[in-house]
Amino acid sequence: MHLIIFLFYFIIMSSRFSFAETIQIDFTADDSYSVEVAKINVGDTIEWSPKNEGHNVEFLGGPDFSSLPEKSDLNAFYSVTFNLPGVYLYHCTPHGNMGMLGLVIVGNDFHNLKDIEGIELSRVAKSVLQRLIRIAQSNS
């Protein structure tokens, strides 16, 4: 009987901490993402919704450049589950040079931040990236 109680308690307590979360990000009318810096845990999912037309998600960098998520279609719902800790940079393909960028920080891990900062961007996008990095680091 004690074993059953222990197992029940263990399952309840461990499942309480193992649920992955889903974050919702919308494409906005002002050519930005509704959440510009998303801080998530390993195993969490981000869903991008086309609340405004003419936008998509294209990853420019992450902890492993060889296995970045594929670019989404324009005006399409898009979902990515993040299983590798680190910093991910993405933009809207048509509006990236105008600063439509987003950062995902997985597991509060900034080990690849220098690689992200080294990605070639327009002057406007580089300025936006620096602002997003300051936001991410101030909340860590």
Language-model segments: which ranges?
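Sec-dependent N-terminal signal peptides of Gram-positive bacterial secreted proteins and lipoproteins
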Residues: 10-11
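Extracytoplasmic copper-binding redox domains, predominantly the cupredoxin/blue-copper superfamily
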Residues: 18-140
